[in-house]
Amino acid sequence: TSARGQLDLVKMYYGQLDKEGFIIDERFNGGGQLADRFLELMTRPVIYNLYWRHGKGTTVPSKTNTGPMGMLINGWAGSGGDGLPWAFREMNAGPIVGERTIGILVGPATGHQLIDGGGITVPGARLYYNNGNWFDEGVGVKPDFAVWDDPNLIIQGRDPQMEKVVKEVMDLLKTKPGVATPPPAKEDRTAKGLNKKNN
């Protein structure tokens, strides 16, 4: 969720808008900023559609994908890496798979330089849920499906967490596919056709 991560998101997300679903791999996300920009971009609804004279349709906003999503998390994700899956769950955006995040999300922090060259950060705020409870600092975000990153499988070239989230998103594609509204039947927009419609 750093500035670099936001640039990568835009590049990778827009490059794959034609896919039927998405998997957000936020394992090892060391943080940076809160995830509102990420989630606003990935969960934009289609407000209406345009059908152009040349026969192509577009959505408005034009950069949307309403297919199902899933997220991967692990114990190396913290701070903004806690915030992204936390917000993903708050928005009911899709299943979360993997291992619990670190739980070091406190809030926006300011940095202070020390005279020995070191530094400290001091959070000026703390996050809490819409239900009025504090974010579970020290606990982190627990996955919907706990899957251990088994090193025995990894050395075989497998990724058990990825395999599980792919299965979950593929299952969602069968029950909750993305919204793709076809254009209505063409109308006779001549004066004669419009008169018939209005009578």
How would you label these PLM feature ranges?
Residues 8-11, 15, 136, 162, ...:
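Hydrophobic transmembrane signal anchors and adjacent membrane-proximal interface regions, especially
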Residues 1-118, 153-161, 167-175, 199:
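Cleft-lining beta-strand/loop regions that shape enzyme active-site pockets
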Residues 171-199:
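Gram-negative outer-membrane assembly/targeting C-terminal domains
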Residues 142, 156-158, 183-186:
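Juxtamembrane/interface motifs at transmembrane-helix termini
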Residues 146-153:
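C-terminal or mid-to-C-terminal helical accessory/interaction module adjacent to the motor/catalytic core
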Residues 77-79, 114-146:
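Metal-dependent DNA phosphodiester-chemistry modules and their immediately adjacent helices/loops
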